[in-house]
Swiss-Prot record:
It holds the Pfam family TPR_Slam. It is a multi-pass membrane protein. It comes from the Bacteria. This is Surface lipoprotein assembly modifier 2. Keywords: Cell outer membrane, Membrane, Signal, Transmembrane, Transmembrane beta strand. The keyword Lipid metabolism does not apply. The lineage of its organism: Bacteria, Pseudomonadati, Pseudomonadota, Betaproteobacteria, Neisseriales. Consists of a soluble N-terminal domain and C-terminal probable beta-barrel in the outer membrane with 14 predicted beta-strands. It comes from Neisseria meningitidis serogroup B (strain ATCC BAA-335 / MC58).
Length: 505
């Protein structure tokens, strides 16, 4: 019901621009516009013979509004401008009962209700129907373009915004159209991001802790030692989303990252990894799905794979290719609301190593299954977590008459928390931890049983908004990793502290 006192109809909505004319603008209460609405409705009251008695609140029910169709239509238009879903729903149902109601106004109400209720596909369908029947209506054109943008139909949204930009519209409306077109260009243009940071690694050569074993009645101990090295971590990513039709896109994405110890004269310990995708992606307001074939490379700081006596070049910047492979990724992400998302992905690829001995054991296929979720808590915190399963199946099931012990299955879980500390002036923190079990097949080397690993990893990152400069955001990072195993040579322990500088352009 609507309540009336002192000759003014109190409509609980913000009178302002519509979804299309003011989309993406903050919701504000325009007191001047609201006063004009109230005065306009008050004039309608003055024309009626309904008198005020004892200054009591007057209740306006559906029958009264049906008896005053102009007042009902005026209120519905104001509710549309204010994006008030409950009020629109009540007034639209009443308005449709009028014998000579405006079908276009009613259609706009149903379309906006679908949009506000989180049904963007339905909203687009309704606006497209309205636009097909009323191609000259500027308001419907803008509402349609905004709805298509919200549902990530960027190609048609850009086309309709381009049409609107040619119309004789008020300057604020044209400015808003320009903002939408700029956003669309940013989403479909080339996007680059990357980072470079100094790092100190206490175990750059990935050596196992010192251990001893019995061999023919003699004790043999390892001689390798962990080597400390200062290096540079680097990462760069490029992405291009090309609209095809409606929610369908061609996606190109590539990334490469690694560590170089060039300045420590230990380039032999360099490592890197790169992957490039090119495939189909479906994307709308609620979900994203993709089929993405990819090519990947694994990089190394040394090319002396088979020639063990070859002298190592410890002052080399470009890495060598250690292994490469091709595969495909199937992925799906669902967002039930803006603050919560679920993701699942499947991967399959085949890898090939350059080194003959390693290729004999490690050429083969790898399958992965990944499930993750992220939840926004309030305005400044996000928690996330997931489960990962990976298996490696070597091309050669047996080597030298024994089961290939490079085959494994890995189960892992991880969780994390990201927080923006506004009370500290813009400090941002991110902490994550993971645990996994990796079980190998066959008998491990120098052992009588299969290898069983347990892997722990912890990472922490701190950054501050006030320290950013032209899109470059420095962060202090700490990483710790530990692997426990039933075979001594597979044990690992490593920690790293580094300052990163990430940027997007």
């Amino acid at each position: 019901m609507l309540y009336f006192r002192y000759g003014f109809l109190v409509v609980w909505c913000a009178a302002g621009v519509s979804a299309a004319y003011g989309a993406d603008a903050p919701a504000i209460l325009d007191d001047k516009a609201l006063l004009q609405v109230q005065r306009s409705v008050s004039d309608k009251w003055a024309e009626s013979d309904w008198k005020v008695e004892n200054d009591a609140p007057r209740v306006v029910d559906g029958d009264f509004l049906l008896a005053h169709p102009k007042m009902l239509e005026h209120s519905l238009r104001d509710a549309l401008n204010g994006n008030q879903a409950d009020l629109i729903a009540s007034l639209a149902d009443l308005y449709a009962k009028l014998p000579d109601y405006d079908a276009v106004l009613y259609g706009r109400a149903r379309a906006l209700l679908a949009k506000l209720a989180g049904r963007p596909a339905e909203a687009v369908a309704r606006y497209r129907e309205l636009h097909g029947e009323n191609a000259a209506d500027e308001r419907i054109l803008l509402d349609l373009a905004a709805a298509e943008f919200d549902d990530f139909r960027l190609k048609s949204a850009e086309r309709h915004f381009a049409e609107a930009a040619k119309l004789d519209l008020p300057a604020p409306v044209l400015e808003n159209v320009g903002r939408f077109r700029k956003k669309t260009e940013g989403l479909t243009g080339w996007r680059f991001s990357g980072g470079i940071s100094p790092a100190v690694n206490r175990n750059a050569n990935n050596a196992a802790p010192q251990y001893c074993r019995q061999n023919g009645g003699r004790q043999i101990c390892s001689v390798s030692r962990a080597e400390r090295a200062a290096g540079l971590n680097y990462e760069i990513e490029a992405e291009k989303l090309t609209p095809l039709a409606d929610n369908h896109y061609l996606l190109f994405r590539s990334n490469i990252g690694g560590t170089s110890y060039y300045f420590s004269k230990k380039s032999a310990y360099d490592d890197g990894f790169g992957r490039a995708y090119l495939g189909w992606q479906y994307k709308n307001a609620r979900q994203t799905a993709g089929i993405l074939p990819f090519y990947q490379v694994q990089l190394s700081g040394s090319d002396g794979f088979d020639a063990k006596t070859k002298r190592v070049n410890n002052r080399r910047l470009p890495p060598y290719m250690l292994a490469h492979g091709v595969g495909v990724q199937l992925s799906h992400t669902y967002r039930p609301n803006p603050g919560w998302q679920f993701s699942v992905a499947l991967e399959h690829y085949r890898q090939r190593y350059r080194e003959q001995d390693r290729a004999e054991y490690n050429n083969g296929r790898q399958d992965g299954f990944y499930v993750s979720s992220a939840k926004r808590l309030g305005e400044s915190a996000t928690v996330f977590g997931g489960w990962q399963f990976v298996r490696f199946v070597p091309k050669r099931e047996t080597v030298g008459g024994a089961v290939n012990n490079a085959a494994y299955r890995r189960n892992g879980v991880y969780a994390g928390w990201a927080q923006e500390w506004r009370q500290l002036g813009g400090l941002n923190s991110r902490v994550s931890a993971s645990y996994a079990r990796r079980n190998y097949k066959g008998i491990a080397a120098f052992s009588t049983e299969a290898q069983r690993n347990r892997e722990w990893n912890v990472s922490l990152a701190l950054s501050h908004d006030k320290l950013s400069y032209k899109g470059i955001v420095p962060a202090l990072n700490y990483r710790f990793g530990r692997t426990e195993s039933n075979v001594p040579y597979a044990k690992r322990r490593n920690s790293e502290v580094f300052v990163s500088a990430d940027w997007r352009f």
